[in-house]
Structures are given as structure tokens and as C-alpha cells.
Amino acid sequence: MAELSISSLESLTLKGLYEKAKEYKVSYYAKLTKKELIFAILKAQAEKDGFLFMDGILEIIPSEGFGFLRPINYSPSAEDIYISASQIRRFDLRNGDKVSGKVRPPKENERYYGLLHVDAVNGEDPEIAKERVHFPALTPLYPDRLMSLETETKKVSTRIIDLMTPVGFGQRGLIVAPPKAGKTMLLKQIANSISANHPDTKLIILLVDERPEEVTDIERSVHPDVDVVSSTFDEVPENHIKVSELVLERAMRLVEHKKDVVILMDSITRLARAYNLVIPPSGRTLSGGIDPAAFHRPKRFFGAARNIEEGGSFTILATALVDTGSRMDDVIYEEFKGTGNMELHLDRSLAERRIYPAIDILKSGTRKEELLVSKSHLDKIWAIRKTMQDSPDFVERFLRRMRASKNNEEFFQNMEEDMKRKGTARR
């Protein structure tokens, strides 16, 4: 029987794939998408030949040239698959590539599975993957496509973001969060809105130095297709860095394939703290005890977010911790403050009064928002901002009015009617 490849299967019609699926006894093949069906057939063929069909995220060992595919949480595990230097060179594989193929179990004196044949790279034919442009050569642009987050009437948080701090594909956003202001809840709502409104977007949630129970909570709260990658507080700082950098490389590889990628990160502050513990001391120290050299690599991570002229985008929304009682955290926030093109501030005083979402609408905003929303929409946003007051009572009234409207469009209509009534009353 002829060896199947991803390219030969992609050239078949759905009817042809169904015939192959019957031949290889693939279950429930009619319910699968074309992509899922191709991988199910490849897996069935590998098992028929006495092998396994596995995939993982590639991490190349720099000094050796070979690498390992990490199938579990982007981290080393007993399930890792060895991939030779010759396979990496042949297909121009890079850190963060998702490599799929036939795998043999470890032999008597071996620790790892061995990759026999590369069948797919990031879901594409390996020969096509060789031709892609490297991420640094892609042209960065301001975000110009709105990432709509509005879903249900009750989900006011995401409706406010759409109104006052619109997020575009390729946004580099900071969520500035004091303790107990509802940042985890907000991240979950943003994640679920992206999954609902933009199912083709690849979403990764990266949790650095977080509590293990919080990781479980987020895993159970989001869509199954979302990658929740974590390095909890009981791991060493080196692990925080390793996992974060592999997630970054993964996102870059997908953007090279012209995909839209979103990373929701909690938090950039803790990643910077991890780098501060690991990097060789430069001999200089900023206020709070942080080494200036510790900022370079977290800034490289955050700075990778961009809209791409050639197609695809890379969005990062990262939390920055403030008012924690640590001077270091404030210095880290000040250092990242000017690097983003969108900021969403959470207000502790609102959270203490149990006013949720505790968003400080006055301080929050997006650069170049005119590229994301229409002129009429922008005029309405500016009209709202002109009437704003820096008080919890105003925010409470604003939230009450939002909940009274079904969606943002209705909220705008109600606001226009109010302004007309006030204008008539003045006359």
C-alpha cells in the first residue's frame, strides 16, 4: 500500500477522504472536518504499520543541534519525542513548530520516543513549511481589524472593552491590575469572547508564577481548543522562562503561517521578576532591586505583538501588577508603560465597593483607535468621555445604563436620545 502524506490527502476530495477513512477503519469520520480527517487517516496508517502517530512542540537544544517534541504543557516530560538534527535541518524546523509524524517507542537503552518521519509541520505539508518567511522579516503595522469581544448582554466587561478600549488584531495591551480587582475573571471573559466570536484565532493563555488551583480553574472555564500553558509558583524561575519563551516561539511560528494568534498572559510582572533572578548581574540596580538587564527579554516577549502586513497577526494582552506593596512591581510597570498600544486599568476602590467590572474607564484607552472603529462610533466614544467624572458613583451609573441595554448599539441609541432630550430642555 502506498505511503500516505499530508499533501496527497489534501489533494483528495471529501468523498475520496471518506473512502480512505473506511479503508483504515476510522470511526465517526463523517463528523470530522477535512483537517481532522487527514490526521485521523495518518494516525490510523501509522498504527496499522505498528508505529504511533504523535505530535509535540519542538524545542531545539542549541549546543547539540537535535531537539525534543514536547507533547505536554510545552514542558519536558516522560512522553517527549527525540527528533534528529538531520530532520531539523532538512525541513528548516524552528523552536515552537508543532511537528506531527510516525514515532517508535524507546528501545531497551533509550529514554525517549524517536520520530521516524515528519508528516506535518503546524498542520501543513513539511515541504510548504520550508518556504515560510522568518518572523523578524515580516512587516509590523498598527492594528486595523477590530477584535470584537461583545457576546451577551450580561457580559458587561467585554462590552466596555469594545466601547472604550477597542482591541485590534495585533494589539499589544497591558491590563494594569491591583490585587483583588478581578483580573482573573476578566481574562476568562476575554478568552471566552475570543473563542465565541473568532473561532479561527489561535488562543494561548500563559500563566507564570500562578497558584495551581487558579490554573485548574482557568482550564475548566475556557474552550477546550484553548492552550492553557502554566508554570506555577512552586517551579524554579528557569522553568517560568523556558515555558514562556517556547510559547512565544510557538506564536511566532503560527504567525509565519499567516494565522491570527492571541496570548493572554498573567503576568508580565512575574516574568520580569523571574528574569531578574536568572540573568547574570550587570552591576547596576534600579529602585526596588531590579537589574536593568532583566528587562531586555521580557520586552522582547511583549514587543513581539504586532499586526502583520503580509497576513496574520500576533496579539498579546498581559497583566501588569501594581499596588502590591512591592517597589519592584511598580518599577516593572513603569518600564512597560510606554511599550504597549492599549492600556486597560482596573480600579481597586471600585472592587472594594463590589462594583464589577472594576474598570477605570477614564484611565483606559487604545492608541490609534480610529483605525479600529468607524468615525460615527468614535464620535460617540468621545462624547461619552467628555461627560465622564472620576468617581465611583459615575462608574456605577454607567454600568447600570449598560446593563439596561441589550448591546452596545442600543446603548449608543439610548445615549443619543438622552442628549437630544437635554438639548431640547435647555432651549
What are these regions (language model features)?
Residues 41-43, 60-62, 71-73, 85, ...:
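Flexible glycine-/small-residue-rich
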Residues 5, 13-16, 64, 195, ...:
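OB-fold/S1-family RNA-binding modules
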Residues 1-49:
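Basic helix-extension-helix modules of the SAP/HeH family
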Residues 93, 106-175:
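P-loop NTP-binding catalytic core
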Residues 55, 83-86, 102-105, 114, ...:
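Short beta-alpha junctions and helix-cap segments that line functional grooves
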Residues 50-54, 156-160, 247-249:
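Phosphate-interacting basic helix/loop segments used at nucleotide- and nucleic-acid interfaces
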Residues 35-129:
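N-terminal "pre-motor" subdomain/linker immediately upstream of P-loop NTPase catalytic cores
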Residues 173, 181-184, 189-427:
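P-loop NTPase catalytic core
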